[in-house]
């Protein structure tokens, strides 16, 4: 049985990897072996950080809500508990946006939370 070298397949695979490595520094964008390692590592980082991004944004929203809540005389946990008791179903992203862009509306939410905590 004759030997099959697989030239076109190999070339396509290498071309695909080098295309993904476009913009990398040094040998990482030019040499297949190094580029392949870096592309695999980059894809792992991308997969991990797509999940990390969700956690990072949640943390950021909580920090912003906490800062605004303390200006209104509440802690973050008491504000969120008060809103839950009031039956207000707005997520942290929206509450954080109100805290940054519309302090008056956030103050109304804080007052609502305070009122429901004292019941």
Curated annotation (Swiss-Prot):
A Gene Ontology BP annotation from the UniProt entry: ribosomal large subunit assembly
PROSITE patterns (UniProt xref): RIBOSOMAL_L20 (PS00937)
Entry-linked InterPro entries: Ribosomal_bL20, RIBOSOMAL_L20_CS, Ribosomal_protein_bL20_C
Keyword Iron-sulfur: no
A GO cellular component annotation in the UniProt record: ribonucleoprotein complex
Alphabetized Pfam families for the sequence: Ribosomal_L20 (PF00453)
Molecular function via GO: rRNA binding; structural constituent of ribosome
Record's keyword terms, sorted: Ribonucleoprotein, Ribosomal protein, RNA-binding, rRNA-binding
SUPFAM superfamilies: Ribosomal protein L20 (SSF74731)
Superkingdom per UniProt: Bacteria
Role this protein plays: Binds directly to 23S ribosomal RNA and is necessary for the in vitro assembly process of the 50S ribosomal subunit. It is not involved in the protein synthesizing functions of that subunit.
Family label: Belongs to the bacterial ribosomal protein bL20 family.
Protein name: Large ribosomal subunit protein bL20
């Amino acid at each position: 049985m004759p030997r099959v070298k697989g030239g076109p397949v190999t070339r396509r695979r290498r071309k695909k990897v080098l295309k993904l490595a476009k913009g990398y520094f040094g040998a990482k964008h030019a040499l297949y072996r190094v580029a392949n390692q870096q592309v695999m590592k980059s894809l792992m980082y991308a997969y991990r950080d797509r999940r990390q991004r969700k956690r990072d944004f949640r943390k950021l929203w909580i920090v912003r809500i906490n800062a605004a809540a303390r200006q209104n005389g509440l802690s973050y946990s008491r504000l969120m508990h008060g809103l839950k008791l009031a039956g207000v179903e707005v997520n942290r992203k929206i509450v954080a946006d109100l805290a940054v862009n519309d302090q008056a509306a956030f103050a109304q939410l804080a007052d609502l939370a305070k009122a429901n905590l004292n019941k």
